[in-house]
UniProtKB/Swiss-Prot annotation:
Recorded superkingdom: Bacteria
Residues forming coiled coils: none
Record GO terms (molecular function): aspartic-type endopeptidase activity
Compartments where found: Cell inner membrane
Record's protein name: Lipoprotein signal peptidase
Pathway: Protein modification; lipoprotein biosynthesis (signal peptide cleavage)
Enzyme Commission number, as recorded: 3.4.23.36
Keyword Transmembrane among UniProt keywords: yes
Length: 166
């Protein structure tokens, strides 16, 4: 017997769409208005800087000859499938976990789209202090990191007391 989808964590999939729209929209604006390597200062310690990432986080495996594109695409698809299954098994009222899963799925799909469409991931957020620059990243990366942090946070929060049955 199946349960109504609105009573499951799948109720939170709308957040995946929001993350995708914001992420892909920001990348579209960068691609339309920046040449590769262009930089525009936004605030002290924060630039928009168009970079291409052919690898994973911190350009891991970026110079590996192209196979990593499909490897990371497969990982993204696998993680998305697992997280959607976890959302289906969870209750809609488990907000923190479902929001975390949706953020990770949205970010993974945003970067997956880039990998499959362009062959690289569009990065544009350049955070720096003095001459030290953090790795350039994008909004999908931010969504994934926030989602992962929420999962860790949830692990430290007290669990609700189980209802006693009379």
């Amino acid at each position: 017997m199946s349960k109504p989808l609105c009573s499951t964590g799948l109720r939170w999939l709308w957040l995946v769409v929001v993350v995708l729209i914001i992420d892909l929209g920001s990348k579209y604006l960068i691609l339309q208005n920046f040449a590769l390597g262009d930089t525009v200062g936004l605030f002290p310690s924060l630039n928009l800087h168009y970079a291409r990432n052919y690898g994973a986080a911190f350009s891991f495996l970026a110079d590996s000859g192209g196979w990593q594109r499909w490897f990371f695409a497969g990982i993204a698809i696998g993680i998305c499938v697992i997280l959607v299954a976890m959302m289906y098994r969870s209750k809609a009222t488990q907000k923190l976990n479902n929001i975390a899963y949706a953020l990770i799925i949205g970010g993974a799909l945003g970067n997956l789209f880039d990998r499959l469409w362009h062959g690289f991931v569009v990065d544009m957020i350049d955070f720096y202090v003095g001459d030290w620059h953090f790795a350039t990243f994008n909004l999908a990366d931010s969504a994934i990191c926030i989602g992962a942090a929420l999962i860790v946070l949830e692990g430290f929060l007290p669990k609700p007391a189980a209802k006693e049955q009379a």
